[in-house]
Amino acid sequence: MTELLGSYVPIAIFIGIALVIGLALLVAPFAVAFKAPDSEKLSAYECGFNAFDDARMKFDVRFYLVSILFIIFDLEVAFLFPWAVSFKEMGWFGFWSMMVFLLVLTVGFIYEWKKGALEWN
């Protein structure tokens, strides 16, 4: 048991060093930075002019929907590549499990299409 856990010691040391360096990089600017706020430093600056309007714009919900659909189908491709590489070793169970996965995604895509979620009218 100790031999098994002993092989993880370098990984634990690496994670510990990474955490210490990350926290040091997060805390260092607050400890070292010179703070002298004035009206010009606190004002909004945009291309040499004061801001004309509020920088926050309302986005249509369809942009978020398209981005979520992109992420879903991008993950589908990420699952398809390892499946295609190890297709011969997995046999029929791997084939049919991927077909079920693709069927669920296809049904979801058809549902989104029929509901009109992809229409931009």
From Swiss-Prot:
Q: Membrane spanning segments where?
A: 11-31, 65-85, 90-110
Q: Write the Enzyme Commission number(s) for this entry.
A: 7.1.1.-
Say if the entry is tagged with keyword Cell inner membrane: yes
Alphabetically sorted, this entry's keywords are: Cell inner membrane, Cell membrane, Membrane, NAD, Quinone, Translocase, Transmembrane, Transmembrane helix, Transport, Ubiquinone
Reading the lineage from the top rank, the first entry is Bacteria
Family annotation (InterPro entries): NAD(P)H_OxRDtase_bac/plastid, NADH_UbQ/plastoQ_OxRdtase_su3, NDAH_ubi_oxred_su3_sf
**Gene3D superfamilies with a match to the protein in the record:** NADH:ubiquinone/plastoquinone oxidoreductase, chain 3
- Supply one GO molecular-function term: NADH:ubiquinone reductase (non-electrogenic) activity
Instruction: Name the major location.
Output: membrane
Instruction: Tell me where it resides.
Output: Cell inner membrane
Q: Where is the signal peptide?
A: none
What role does it play? NDH-1 shuttles electrons from NADH, via FMN and iron-sulfur (Fe-S) centers, to quinones in the respiratory chain. The immediate electron acceptor for the enzyme in this species is believed to be ubiquinone. Couples the redox reaction to proton translocation (for every two electrons transferred, four hydrogen ions are translocated across the cytoplasmic membrane), and thus conserves the redox energy in a proton gradient.
Q: Which family does it belong to?
A: Belongs to the complex I subunit 3 family.
Quaternary state and interactors: NDH-1 is composed of 14 different subunits. Subunits NuoA, H, J, K, L, M, N constitute the membrane sector of the complex.
List, alphabetically, the PANTHER family matched. NADH-UBIQUINONE OXIDOREDUCTASE CHAIN 3
Tell me what this protein is called: NADH-quinone oxidoreductase subunit A 1
